[in-house]
């Protein structure tokens, strides 16, 4: 049963939590290189980028098991083989993130949210040891007050533990938070935490359209969350060279634009 629920009908969310791979960055090329390097060590043929794209989303261990199985189903893979392959994969992936790219619209969106006082957190199933170096290389780390990796807590998404932990640390209730992701795990974690979820169409969802997971909102670009949603338009951020009074005037103008978008989003409904 569906129930009508406004999508931040009167104000900005106080906290926005983001997934990483498939949401903020396209890391498939580097992950594929590491997977194929691991498979080569076992004398196996490369998996290739399209298969790896469908296997991502449940952490490094599951990715490695899927690569060994050559399928999204991996029940037949033993623990000893998994441990050996995981060590090779981790070593290969630690070498470089040269092929990873930030998706269009991400930096504009993070800048806008930060300038407007919205707290941000990163919650990913990627092992913690890889997260900080990647964020530094992509110049994204500065935007997040809280960063939770796949082994920071005992649980990973779709378990809501990381979302609940961040909200507790921030002192923010679920109705004042938003989760942005790209996969079934992200949507399930958000729903379990009682948080609205915006899901991106371009990410990694095992080859399935993200709309099938029934998030609160489906978007094609992270900039769709902003007042200036026209992809051809440049988002104008507050100018640091302006006087304090002019900056306040500019912030008020941007906030008025955002309120129009929020009222439009109030038409979206939760889907059971």
Swiss-Prot record:
One of its GO terms (biological process) is glycolate biosynthetic process. Its cofactor is Mg(2+). The keyword S-adenosyl-L-methionine does not apply. SUPFAM superfamilies: HAD-like (SSF56784). Pfam families: HAD_2. GO terms for molecular function: metal ion binding; phosphoglycolate phosphatase activity. Its EC number is 3.1.3.18. InterPro entries: HAD-like_hydrolase_sf, HAD-like_sf, HAD-SF_hydro_IA, HAD_2, HAD_sf, PGP-like_dom2, PGPase_prok. Mg(2+) binds at residues 19, 21, 182. It catalyses: 2-phosphoglycolate + H2O = glycolate + phosphate. Keywords: Carbohydrate metabolism, Hydrolase, Magnesium, Metal-binding. Pathway: Organic acid metabolism; glycolate biosynthesis; glycolate from 2-phosphoglycolate: step 1/1. Belongs to the HAD-like hydrolase superfamily. CbbY/CbbZ/Gph/YieH family. This is Phosphoglycolate phosphatase 1. It comes from Pseudomonas aeruginosa (strain ATCC 15692 / DSM 22644 / CIP 104116 / JCM 14847 / LMG 12228 / 1C / PRS 101 / PAO1). The lineage of its organism: Bacteria, Pseudomonadati, Pseudomonadota, Gammaproteobacteria, Pseudomonadales.
